[in-house]
Curated annotation (Swiss-Prot):
HAMAP family: Lys_tRNA_synth_class2 (MF_00252). Homodimer. It catalyses: tRNA(Lys) + L-lysine + ATP = L-lysyl-tRNA(Lys) + AMP + diphosphate. Mg(2+) 1 binds at residues 409, 416. Its cofactor is Mg(2+). Belongs to the class-II aminoacyl-tRNA synthetase family. The keyword Magnesium applies. This is Lysine--tRNA ligase. The keyword ATP-binding applies. GO terms for biological process: lysyl-tRNA aminoacylation. It is found in: Cytoplasm. GO terms for cellular component: cytosol.
Length: 496
């Protein structure tokens, strides 16, 4: 170790390195080797929950545990400590006369943050706390940095997000939140697998951004000397698989959008997209409701979900309303009536709804009214369907009113949780929609996409009537963990 580096270390770090060297001198690897446990902390608590101090003493049972040393007290020949493993904490009771002088020194010199293995007798203290009375201590790994002060609840937000490992060590609530996230995703998989869906993987690098309205990240493939984009959706590749005959497919994966960051947006996030042949958007509404209710029940049990003090009736049938009806109910404006673009713009001006340069159809105005007046009112789970064709380039037109599509979005607590539709499988109509998107892009719409001719070719081979769905996994995890910022459900959120 260089002198320069030593000078950068604080006193505690220097002492810990000295202890590391001392372990080596004793023939002990400071960073340990394989260690076999017989139980974790929770398994022991569950197994012996109904046994008191005397009953445990009479059973004379032993266990071998391992974990991070997070508390330590005592002096002389007796010490108490807590080890933390994935499931929680358990106390250890160490006596010099039980483990021997040399072994006791390992415990005595261990620092908070070190990993220890402990063999011993399962017991209860006079206070009733389940503990392991050590018969042997094994040093497993040396922590060369001390845990943060007040590590029982790390509170510095920057540290929490930049050094998630410290947050996981320090905040059990945070640790459990990410365990819950994992369970939510596992249960969604289980639900779809049981319904005959195949989980598939599609490319992250695309030649052309598509499947959503979003600005992509652009990268360059050196070997082929071509620009590529990180995917903004998995949609178009998954629908190619429907063309190929897979019939029921889904993908859970990372999506990348080169856009702003706020409480519900991160440049990379996790979504699930699901496609089902021979289905329409009504079938997908039922599927969406089932997915979300199953996920909620798996982590919250039966009944409603409490989110930031509001009771969300996620266990009841979700409300369903047409976008035009929702706008009319709140504003009195009736977009069922036929009108020109100029008439729609005049109504927008009267209601002080901003009109962007790329609003070239009445449908753009309708969507702007919805975003301005309706979204903020949608607290309970609500399917809003019937989006205008102008803002739904991949959705099938409604056969009864071709200004609108067989599309829906799911809203909960004013936020969009899912987007779905009866998929457009007419390649000629799809090409004209792509061309309209390309024109909007030229007019300054950063979220409009170009034309994916390969996808058009795939459709020309024939795609069966299909329903498709996308759900933002992170927002769903926020809802089911009562979290207000997406950074609290992403292990490693994007930071400046």
């Amino acid at each position: 170790m260089s002198t320069e580096h030593m000078e950068e270390l604080n006193d505690q770090q220097i002492v810990r390195r000295e202890k590391m060297a001392a372990l080596r001198e004793q023939g002990i690897d400071p960073f340990g080797k394989r260690f076999e446990r017989t139980a974790n902390s929770q398994e022991l608590k569950d197994k012996y929950a109904n046994l008191d101090k005397e009953q445990l003493h009479d059973k004379n049972e032993t266990a071998t545990i391992a974990g991070r040393l997070i508390t330590k007290r005592g002096k002389g020949k007796v010490g108490f400590a807590h080890l933390q493993d994935r499931e929680g904490q358990i106390q250890i009771y160490v006596r010099k006369d039980a483990v021997g002088e040399e072994n006791y020194e390992i415990f005595k010199k261990a620092d908070l943050g070190d990993f220890l293995g402990v063999e011993g007798e399962v017991m209860r203290t006079d206070m009733g706390e389940l503990s392991i009375k050590a018969t042997h201590i094994t040093h497993l790994s040396k922590a060369l940095r001390p845990l943060p002060e007040k590590f029982h609840g790390l509170t510095d937000v920057e540290t929490i997000y930049r050094k998630r490992y410290l947050d996981l060590i320090s905040n059990r609530e945070s640790f459990e939140r990410f365990v819950t996230r994992s369970k939510i995703i596992s249960e969604i998989r289980r639900y779809l697998d049981q319904k005959g869906f195949l989980e598939v993987e599609t490319p992250v690098l695309h030649n052309e951004a598509g499947g959503a309205a979003a600005r992509p990240f652009i990268t360059h493939h050196n070997a082929q000397n071509i620009d590529m984009v990180l995917r903004i959706a998995t949609e178009l590749h998954l629908k190619r698989l429907i063309v190929g005959g897979m019939e029921r497919v889904y993908e859970i994966g990372r999506i990348f959008r080169n856009e702003g960051m706020d409480a519900t947006h991160n440049p990379e996030f996790t979504s699930i997209e699901v496609y089902q042949a021979y289905a329409d958007f009504q079938d997908i509404m039922d599927l969406t409701e089932g997915i979300i209710q199953h996920a909620a029940k798996s982590v919250k049990g039966d009944g409603p979900v409490n989110y930031q003090g509001t009771e969300i009736k996620i266990n009841e049938p979700f409300k369903r309303v047409h976008m035009v009806d929702a706008i009319r109910e709140i504003t009195g404006v009736d977009f069922w009536q036929d009108m020109t673009l100029e008439e729609a713009k005049a109504i927008a001006a009267e209601k002080k709804v901003p009109v962007e340069k790329h609003y070239t159809e009445v449908g753009h105005i309708i969507n702007a009214f919805f975003e301005e007046f309706v979204e903020e009112t949608l607290i309970q789970p609500t399917f809003v369907y019937g989006h205008p064709v102008a803002v739904s380039p991949l959705a099938k037109k409604n056969p009864e009113d071709q200004r609108f599509t067989d599309r829906f979005e799911l809203f909960i607590m004013t936020k969009e949780y899912g987007n779905a539709f009866t998929e457009l499988n007419d390649p000629i109509d799809q090409l004209s929609r792509f061309e309209a998107q390309a024109k909007a892009k030229e007019l300054g719409d950063d979220e409009a996409t170009g034309i994916d001719y390969d996808y058009i070719e795939a459709l020309e081979y024939g795609m069966p009537p299909t329903g498709g769905l996308g759900i933002g996994i992170d927002r769903l995890c926020m809802l089911l963990t009562d979290t207000t910022t997406i950074r609290d459900v992403l292990l490693f959120p994007t930071m400046k």
